[in-house]
């Protein structure tokens, strides 16, 4: 009995590796992408609820940037959109160092072939030709392929006697393609002039961000120009302008609301209402097609 009393106590040795393993197994985990933080009000939003609300914060109304897939889902009648010209390949006309590799990397990352997707679909049963720019692909910059795809879409719209809707989201001309990129401004504008001569409707929907050469060309040529709320829309950057004119610009300068107030756009439309508004516009102009 006394012998057992003074016997050395046995301990179980637990390694740091076992401790970490236990923590991992017993710590609740949240799957990636389930919750999203609003970059305007800071609220934490449930991803599924956000998607059901058109990727708009239900507290502050902040419109999250969305891509081509979301646009197609929210805009068109189910399974009616048919993509055009997705096989056109981006070239490197100036042999810009690293450009080819960058393009391939972005293609794999975004699953997009270029910064614009074009095609035809139905909105409330009415056909329209649509071009959707996506800022995830090199900030939606306009290169030769972007200009070519939009021009081809407009030319097809003329042949098919259909309205054209362009969703803009761009940082401007693509510097890796130099002057050839700038040429797309005139190219697309020329195609839109032909569309206008044919009496066909062109609606431009400005989304965040729409800047640079896109703003200076086809973004501002719409028969009707719509914009999503609180979108950044302008040509040069705000700080560049302030340094040039040596004046402080208003806080809301280059925002959708500022442009509406000064007559640059026709209407600001929340994303949840865009399909309905576009359907009304197409229906109103049906006789001209």
From Swiss-Prot:
Pathway: Lipid metabolism; malonyl-CoA biosynthesis; malonyl-CoA from acetyl-CoA: step 1/1. Binds 1 zinc ion per subunit. GO terms for molecular function: acetyl-CoA carboxylase activity; ATP binding; carboxyl- or carbamoyltransferase activity; zinc ion binding. It is an enzyme of class 2 (transferase). Zn(2+) binds at residues 38, 41, 57, 60. Its cofactor is Zn(2+). Component of the acetyl coenzyme A carboxylase (ACC) complex. Biotin carboxylase (BC) catalyzes the carboxylation of biotin on its carrier protein (BCCP) and then the CO(2) group is transferred by the transcarboxylase to acetyl-CoA to form malonyl-CoA. This is Acetyl-coenzyme A carboxylase carboxyl transferase subunit beta.
